């Protein structure tokens, strides 16, 4: 959602605030605003996803997606325009090559409609993939661990959370009852929650919630300021030394920002939640008896979608929802999740 005035974080249920014990992440521009504008006619960045040999992003109220190379250059239009994407924020994700989904095909949906579109990885073809969801699409992720059948997970602005299989058939997992934009899966046990559990960041509830495979939901942390995306820091982040590793996020309404892998190594296994209201970058961790939250920001600009990229997603065709680093058969393929923006700037 587009937001301008910071909303103060008030209370955290089941959690406590703490002063960061490490240096805050340092962000720098990865894809410039002018290069995006030259390709698609605007640079109010919203979605951004890693797709194996490229990144694919979206712009607010813009029908055309764009792609970049792995260095943030070579910005070009991706696929053909989709009229439905004119309705506001468009969320972008990439499939993992499991559960019947192809490796790193691109999927996108807009906040104005309950439809998801599929694009071939090279952008040469595209089609409507799933439709009829209640509420506009706010987030798309792929279950890398299997607790949710390796299906696509979609969140909508009505708070509905859907499982969507590889044929595009959707079934309701649960509803949190409010706008939800961030999705991610825990790469290991997180507090009392099992490895592979789905976590969602809800703007409407100002909370981080956990959702079991059976659809039971519980609040993990509340009182967050306009939580936008949630992503677990990959367990092997920075292990390869490859410069592509790191954290990437859309900085509305300007560009794409990146923080190097080393900046997030102190937070491996933690949940990172960005706040849309005032540049917050929340670190949420389990201290053995309770969840503890620290603000390790600021993020430059208004945070939109974001992703962690690690060696496993660079070298192997199996990444994860907006994060792409999970631990599957000894392979790290965690995942992050992010989200989209709202209709009228507020």
What are these model-predicted stretches?
Residues 319-339:
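A short, hydrophobic C-terminal helix/tail in secreted or cell-surface proteins
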Residues 23, 338-341:
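Short A/G/S/P-biased low-complexity tracts
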């Amino acid at each position: 959602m587009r937001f301008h005035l910071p909303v103060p974080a008030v209370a955290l249920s089941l959690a406590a605030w703490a002063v960061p014990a490490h240096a805050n992440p340092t962000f720098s521009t990865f894809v410039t605003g002018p290069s995006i504008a030259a390709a698609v006619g605007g640079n109010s960045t919203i979605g951004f996803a890693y797709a194996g040999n490229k990144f694919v992003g979206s712009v607010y109220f813009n029908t055309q997606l764009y792609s970049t190379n792995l260095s943030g250059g070579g910005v070009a239009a991706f696929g053909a325009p989709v009229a439905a994407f004119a309705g506001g924020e468009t969320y972008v994700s990439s499939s993992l090559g499991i559960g019947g989904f192809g490796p790193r095909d691109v999927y996108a949906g807009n906040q104005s409609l309950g439809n998801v579109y599929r694009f071939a990885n090279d952008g040469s073809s595209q089609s409507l993939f799933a439709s009829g969801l209640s509420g506009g699409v706010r987030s798309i992720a792929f279950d890398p661990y299997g607790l949710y059948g390796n299906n696509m997970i979609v969140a909508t602005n009505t708070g509905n959370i859907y499982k969507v299989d590889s044929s595009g058939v959707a079934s309701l997992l649960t509803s949190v009852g409010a706008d939800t934009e961030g999705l991610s899966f825990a790469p290991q046990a997180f507090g009392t929650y099992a490895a592979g559990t789905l976590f969602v960041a809800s703007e409407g509830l100002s909370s981080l919630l956990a959702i079991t495979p059976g659809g039971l939901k519980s609040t993990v942390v509340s009182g967050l300021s306009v939580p936008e995306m949630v992503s677990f820091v990959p367990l092997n982040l920075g292990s390869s030394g490859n410069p592509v590793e790191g954290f990437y996020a859309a900085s509305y309404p300007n560009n794409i920002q990146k923080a190097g892998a080393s900046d997030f190594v102190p937070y491996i296994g933690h949940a990172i939640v960005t706040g849309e209201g005032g540049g917050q970058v929340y670190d949420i961790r389990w201290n053995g008896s309770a969840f503890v939250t620290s603000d390790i920001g600021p993020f430059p600009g208004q945070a939109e979608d974001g992703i962690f990229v690690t060696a496993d997603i660079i070298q192997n065709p199996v990444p994860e929802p907006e994060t792409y680093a999970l631990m599957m058969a000894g392979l790290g393929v965690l995942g992050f999740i992010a989200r989209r923006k709202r209709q009228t700037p507020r």
